[in-house]
């Protein structure tokens, strides 16, 4: 026994002596938790442990994804060398060969079909520096108007609503630190317990302090279990529910008349409209009983402080922007904004969902959240870039609309960075066919994803452990992620790939950067004076202070913890309310005899986005090895579906097969399927192509479907 103990302690001593520690930041959700990877070398093997590091946002917490993130970074299928497709097979080539091949094909396409025959498709998982550089690359190196990114499918509705209501879009109007002290919270369409687990303690502390929590979700989730009141609206009726809440608040005088008079436009029009509505009709449309609507409205309206949080559940609709605006109508009409423990939070999905939409990846945007159609904004950014403003392209189209442009033959070449559009987009078969139609397609990725399989060239990118640069997290806090390890093989930093490609295209003078910090220095200048002003933020400050909330206009500025304390960002300083009709401009799919159920989609805790990274992590993949269909047992019985049996789900656009999972807590008319899988299990094959007319968000959360047991289908 003594000998065994000695052997154990000597082994542990050896592990400690061989330890290397790498500080990093999680590559997944918008919390951007700080972490430390511990590498222990034991003889010829290496073992890794990840621990959380204290920081202002996650306070040292990690979830299961963060603890296992390193597994995909060290996966044997990581891309380490450039690949070119020859006779249908990928062949390893040198960087010089790959870049020259891209140059020849890009130049040929533009010579034959014009500058806008090339398009760029970006990502909200890359750093601010890379997002900024990608927007500049599209407009300066390629001179194309066609650039958009996968954040269009994630945050566009909330961003549009905040910009229109407040004049500025920062994920949170106040810091996370205020959540525990608010008196009432509305969680609309957000499952933070599974999607952003490390944010949950803020809400748990609020509950401990006596806050009343109202959850709005057609499903019962780990998040709704925290709530004092759970409203289960029919999928797609959240805007109508918000009208009901607002009607009660106005009728029972829970609005802040002084705040409205001094700081709000449009209230009278909204008041007139909602007072004309019938609560009985609202109940019939939403499926939420009048007494529960009234209970929620009275509680939120009567409390001295309150916050509203939205996420994809209310945003991923063809009226997602207007739906969020209606929840913001509630917020501003009750005066719960710009004050202590009051405000709005858009629970950003992707790691850099906030920063990636601020600095030029969006079709209509320039750095600093400037508009590409505004001449003053164009002149300023062109001056920073050293080009003629007339050479800047005008606005392009959204991510999904670029797929339509490919089908129409206008776009013939694509540069794709760190995204998987044939899995993440709606009407996925149409998107896959678009990618196949491209004359030339370049993908930058960690792995040969489902989309990258179709590429002519794949360039190996850097993972979070090798990458360097800033990320802007869920509350609008800019943080610095230092590089921990060198890139494996011949893989390069994403920003280096962009600079190398610009060089072979003859644009080196605009992309002569030698570090991410140099890029950030230019980004600071380009954002200066914009609504998303990063000028006062430096790498030195981020290292010392652990992160800064923008806007931060000067290097001696402490950052902005709470927005709109005295004024909103519109020219007149007022917030803008707007009437949100019960009937949406773009009709949503309605149930019928052939398609009698609503399909809604979402995440599970162990996976992220299209699963390209998490499906390469054994510890995460094992938790959910396949998608599932959550269905109420009574509904399952109606369609002869057994628990844990294979089921065919079919919409007007296609079908998939998944395994059933009975749930007593989901609505009888609704099924839920997570979206992290591809090919025959890609649930987005079933989703409509219709887009929100304001922000171009697809309607992922409402599709009319039918279900049947696979055994019947096969026979």
What positions do the PLM features span?
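Flexible glycine/proline-rich, aromatic-decorated loop/lid segments
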Residues: 219-222, 446-482
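Long, contiguous, secondary-structure-rich segments that constitute the structural scaffold
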Residues: 488-490, 494-545, 594, 610, ...
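Long, low-complexity segments enriched in small/aliphatic residues
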Residues: 357-363, 518-619
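Glycine/threonine-rich flexible loop motifs
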Residues: 192-201, 420-430, 469-472
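N-terminal leader/propeptide and maturation segments of large enzyme subunits in energy/redox metabolism
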Residues: 88-89, 254-290, 367-382, 386-391, ...
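N-terminal export/assembly segments and adjacent metallocofactor-ligating motifs
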Residues: 1-252, 263, 270, 276, ...
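A glycine-rich, hydrophobic/aromatic-adjacent loop/helix-cap motif
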Residues: 301-402, 475, 509, 553-558, ...
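Phosphate/diphosphate-binding loops
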Residues: 11-14, 24-25, 31, 430, ...
